Amino acid sequence: MKKILFAASECVPFIKTGGLADVVGSLPKCFDKRYFDVRVIIPKYLCMSKEYTDKMEYIDNFYMDIGNDNKYVGVFKMEYEGVIFYFIDNEFYFSGAKPYGDLLWDLEKFIYFSKAVLSALPVIGFQPDLIHCHDWQTGLIPVFLKERFHNGDFFRNMKSVMTIHNLKFQGVWDVDTVRTLSGLPDYFFTPDKLEAYKDGNLLKGGLVFADAITTVSNTYAEEIKMPFYGEGLDGLLRARANDLRGIVNGIDYDEYNPATDKFIVKQYNARDFRKEKVKNKLALQEELGLEKDEKKMMIGIVSRLTDQKGFDLIAYIMDELCQDNVQIVILGTGEERYENMFRHFDWKYANKVSANIYYSEALSHKIYAASDAFLMPSLFEPCGLSQLMALHYGTLPIVRETGGLKDTVEPYNEYESTGTGFSFTNYNAHEMLACIRNAERIYYDKKREWNKMVDRAMAADFSWHVSALKYQELYDWLIG
């Protein structure tokens, strides 16, 4: 039995701000229980829902030296859907209204968390063969493991894996502050260890000291070795290329399943989508005040409204696109200029564009079910989950070929009748518009071809079980 511990800053269903929480919450329950004992450890935030905190059972507490201080560490435990979760409790650090705040404060609390995770293991009596760390918040775990803990028998052969969910966030502050907060000796603050461009960098520490590095898609694993995507760490990632692999995220098919989805008006599956899916479109057109027309192509967008997601491209061609015979439904929040741009087009083309500048889980499900196509022209996209949801709902993605989008959406080839979506290569607004118009042409002129693509899209398997098998291979390789 191999014992694995996931360490992260957030996890579904306890606390969520982004895709990281989905991975940490969904992946552990998909491992083969006969060979893998996978548990999770996260901070016990005060802002967690009471329905979970009331069920947590107190295990123990102790005091730990960190920096120049001696800090309280409480440990709680709870079983959820067959997986054991541990929680590190300290109200001084984890009492805010949301999990992240000011960067310097985040830095201090996650340095504390990284050390507390290792210090708590002997107390809870769980001795993992491998600790799987996620993003910069747990970047110091591999460092502490090598520096402070490897002398004792308990930690001697413990391995670590570092997973990059988004390389843009690295946990960077000046060297003196990081040295003081972490209590690490000067030896660790050199350019081949934690120092990057004269600053202390927590993620870099994890990438240098972990036994293996993974990221959330094959293409992204290749891209981050180049300066454009490497965020200043491309040299290190090239040096560690043999230990770096990409494993695509999955989605939870229990939650995102058009056949059982409780948010949508008409449930459907791969056999009956030809006549049932359109009922969701008519219902959404009515709900959002768009022109009711089941034949009109609907393009959905569910996203954070930021540059990373390609909204500068959409801004360039939105007026042109609105001349076409399409409807566009947007859901999300983000940069003010993009929020206002969509509000403007909602006003200008009231029966064609619906801008919903907020976030609603229910509406997102309705958009996945009602739309014919799903637009996602990202500048970079480590994995992306929206296109996987769209595929499963039979809504064909229109994407830029980058990161996980390139790995998961097979572009349509009209000569071979293959593909599950449409893609373009260069980050260029009119290349994107040409791609959208190609999709319109197939939708209006070759509806049978379109429906065959929907068949292939709904049959594609991006469940967590597929990802879990790849992680099991990685663990076998590391632990032996």
Model-found features: residue ranges?
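Catalytic cores of nucleotide-sugar-dependent glycosyltransferases that transfer UDP/GDP/TDP-activated
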Residues: 1-480
